[in-house]
Amino acid sequence: MGFVLFHFTLIVLLASVLTSAACLSAYLVSRKRVLLFAFLAFLFYFFDVAWVLQDELMYPGLDAQMTSAYLMVRSYASILAGAGFLVSFWLVVCTVLGEKSRALMAVPGVVFVVASAVVLIVFPEGNVQRFTFYTLRALLLFWMLGFAAYRYRTTDDSVERGRLRRHLRLYVALWVLGVLVVAEDVLFFLVVDPATLGIGPWAFTSERNYAENALMLVCMFVACRDAFRTLA
């Protein structure tokens, strides 16, 4: 099982790089800002996933139970990567919806970073802290989806409604996968001890969420499709 999960991680990394490159190429051709934000999102996500492997690749002699100092440094790196790709996706949403308010575009990202840091500083170390820390990512995703639904419900422009309805399948998929992200965190932080699964120390860590990987792969497919259409 560990063999499968390791190569699944490599696939996610490769897909992140390819999607990021495709979005950058499409941006250089079209100068559409949404493609620039997508490029940044998938680039940050590449590092977010790549840092998961650092324990085994850079520090193979470390015990499965990392020191609190090491976990703290890694957590702040996770804040950087998480904020990078989530805020970039939020800017994608704002661009697609035609949102012009700079304050609205900036505040969710600032709240995410501050809340993540507060959880690390205030909460006692343990599974509840890690669960809360990583669930903030899902909350930011749900904010994006909720904001998109609000804009759809409040617009009187039938053309705009029709344009947004074309993304309905992606919208539903993101809701379903977002709920699965939280469910996986509940399972592996609060219910099951990953160490009892016996499939390798890195396969299930505080920085792994396979539902999140699946969600991102869906986004990568859509982004690549749109980027290739721009380049065609």
Regions found by a protein language model. Give the residues of each.
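Short aromatic-rich membrane-water interface segments that cap or initiate transmembrane helices
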Residues: 2-4, 67-80, 201-211
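Hydrophobic alpha-helical transmembrane segments of multi-pass membrane proteins
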Residues: 10-25, 34-62, 74-87, 110-119, ...
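Membrane-interface interhelical loops and short amphipathic "cap" helices
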Residues: 1-2, 59-69, 125-132, 193-200
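First transmembrane helix
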Residues: 1-30, 131-156, 210-226
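Membrane-proximal helix-loop-helix units in multi-pass membrane proteins
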Residues: 82-87, 93-149
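Membrane-interfacial loop-to-transmembrane alpha-helix junctions, especially the N-terminal start
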Residues: 29-42, 100-109, 160-173, 231-232
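C-terminal transmembrane-bundle signature of multipass membrane proteins
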Residues: 146-156, 161-232
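Short juxtamembrane and helix-loop transition motifs at transmembrane-helix boundaries
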Residues: 1-5, 64-74, 91-102
